Design a protein with these regions (language model features):
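Beta/alpha (TIM)-barrel catalytic core signal, keyed to glycine-rich beta->alpha loops juxtaposed to Asp/Glu
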Residues: 7, 146-250
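C-terminal segment of N-terminal export signals and the immediately downstream linker at the start
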Residues: 23-53
Length: 250
């Protein structure tokens, strides 16, 4: 009887281990699925179906191609860069990492066009980014960190965009911003049909009631209670909206 009990005990123990192992494997699988992109959404009038989480590259440094590959493997297909990020190294890393996979992603770059910037300067900036990115076009090219309507009103930017689109170097354009005059700049860009896509800072702090809880000054990103209105206007005009600083980070 004791031998039978021992066999039953061992059998039950083995079965329990198998069940426990299967449960852990199931949990690991669920965790892995949870670390992947959950859905893709249309980016406004561009028609691009982009991942619900994008890859920002402002701190991407040489030798970090593996981070780009990790993002690709998890379903991210929207990669955001700029000519100023890590002195151009960020775009170089993106270009290296996306070699052979360019047609699987949407690639974004940005440059700063000022009120007095000439088209020739913008052409040079775009071409330099294309070389670093190892591609002949970008899907989205943005006027970077705009906080002055005069930067958007510069006719050289509009002419540059028109010519670059015609040449197939840019598919969509717009602006990015996160400073004090963001709403005025967005209003101007949308009202004058200067943006297919906008990249804006947006987070829980946009709710004015949130700030009423505090007596000190807070994050410069969010003191713009009119931002929800202008983002709704963007939606009505089919302008794609991408958000950044969603956790109020830098």
């Amino acid at each position: 009887a004791s031998g039978m009990d021992r066999r039953r005990f061992l059998k039950a123990g083995t079965l329990g281990a198998l069940v426990s192992g299967a449960a852990r494997a199931s949990d690991a699988g669920a965790a892995d699925r949870g670390n992947r992109v959950q859905r893709y959404r249309r980016l406004g009038r561009t028609g691009f179906e982009v991942s619900d989480i994008s890859f920002g590259s402002s701190r991407l440094r040489r030798g970090e191609e593996h981070l780009v590959h990790m993002a690709l493997d998890r379903g991210i297909n929207y990669f955001d860069g700029a000519d100023s990020y890590t002195g151009g190294a960020s775009e170089t890393v993106l270009g290296n990492a996306l070699k052979g996979r360019r047609d699987q992603v949407y690639l974004v770059s940005k440059t700063k066009s000022w009120a007095g910037t000439r088209r020739s300067e913008l052409d040079a900036a775009l071409n330099a980014s294309l070389r670093r990115l190892r591609t002949d076009y970008v899907d989205v090219y943005l006027n970077h960190a705009v906080n002055d309507v005069e930067r958007l009103a510069n006719p050289e930017w509009g002419e540059f965009v028109e010519r670059a689109k015609a040449a197939g170097k840019i598919r969509a354009t717009g602006m990015s911003g996160h400073a004090g005059h963001l709403v005025a700049c967005l209003d101007h860009a949308i009202d004058h049909d200067l943006a297919d896509v906008v990249l804006v800072a947006y987070n829980f702090g946009q709710d004015p009631a949130f700030y009423e809880q505090f007596t000190r000054g807070f994050d410069y990103v969010a003191k713009q209670p009119d931002l929800p209105r202008v983002l709704e206007k963007a939606r009505q005009n089919d302008v794609g909206v991408v958000t950044m600083k969603t956790l109020m980070g830098a």
